[in-house]
Amino acid sequence: MLWSKRQQRFFNAWQGVFLRIGRIFGKDDYMEFQIQVLDKNSKARLGVIKTAHGEIPTPIFMPVGTVGSVKGVHQRELSDDINARIILGNTYHLYLRPGTDILERAGGLHRFIGWDRPILTDSGGYQVYSLSATRKIKEEGVKFKSHIDGSSHIFSPESVMGIERSIGADIIMAFDECTPYPCEYSYARASMEMTHRWLDRCVSYLAEHPEKYGYPQSLFPIVQGSTYRDLRRISAEKIASVGADGNAIGGLSVGEPHEVMYEMVDLVCGILPSDRPRYLMGVGTPANILENIALGIDMMDCVMPTRNARNGMLFTAEGTINIKNRKWADDFSPIDLAGYTWVDTAYTKAYLRHLFAADEFLGKQIASVHNLGFYLWLVEQAREHIKAGDFSVWKDMMVRKLDTRL
């Protein structure tokens, strides 16, 4: 049920009252990051992020719910079976549909989608980057055409922060430009400097426009600089100087070799504050996730587990399975005996292959639940091995297996 604006103001007022009462009695709902264990043989760390909507153990993988839904997966499956601790929404897509008016009347994205755990929203910079043929970038912001109906829109740092206030995510990303790969040095530097100026405007806007729903939102600025070490260093130093609740690394996993990505991540993590969470945007394969955890990354997201699932690729601890292959047609063993989620032991490989062959959407749903369950299991295991002190040995063993084609 959508709320009237009067009802929404009433709700916001009382939620703010309860928030203040909680602080009086020692319950601070502002985001907090605690490091619990530092790995002795890598830069991996075990920690927890505390938000108004719950705690997030780190390292963590965040399923992507671009338009307010993780494709093919119910919220109950996400929370109870997959055990996602935080999900993503996207400012660009949510702005176009359903729009900020609907979201505000619903009481924010949490209430609109029925999700009571933390949410992070991307600023839409990557989506605008992907619309290279229909957008123009200037100092004021980005003019682009909707992929839905071709209508023209303008994103500026101020308008994007306003949209993210209306969405109401716990963690909101600063507006930035994601550069392509390869990218000329001159363009990468100019883009990075503009991203820094946009960040200053984001910070100013948020300081003058408080949260709408009675709980705090934490801004994460984004390090850019393409694959140039000097630019990444300059950007990381700028981002570190802001003193934000957390920091992100963007502009990677856009086509550069994995070794280059790891080099940039290692460089930037050595500059960003160690007492704040580090979020690597848009990454990646299971092996990418483990390697970046070893470099000091705490948070990652990617559409890969669900996108690949819809194409019949399953990730497992022993390697990847293309369930469409004929070899699985009469394999009546469970999808995965490891049982990351209930679907893994409820259905057989032969049945799942049949669903894909028959183009039944249920097959894509089952594969999506499995892959997300595996990704969340993988980071849970990473946390356990950091705690146990053998993360590096376990990581090297897992990476060798993860790239195997079964």
What is each of the regions a protein language model found here?
Residues 193, 205, 209, 217-335:
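Glycine-rich phosphate/ribose-binding loops and adjacent secondary-structure elements
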Residues 181-184, 189, 246-252, 361-364:
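Glycine- and acidic
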Residues 20-27:
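Short, positively charged and aromatic/hydrophobic N-terminal segments
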Residues 1-8, 14:
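N-terminal amphipathic/hydrophobic targeting modules at extreme N-termini
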Residues 31-212, 326-329:
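Non-catalytic, usually N-terminal nucleic-acid engagement modules in DNA/RNA processing proteins
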Residues 54, 87, 122, 164, ...:
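Conserved, mostly hydrophobic/aromatic
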Residues 31-48, 56-62, 71-72, 176-182, ...:
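C-terminal extensions of enzymes
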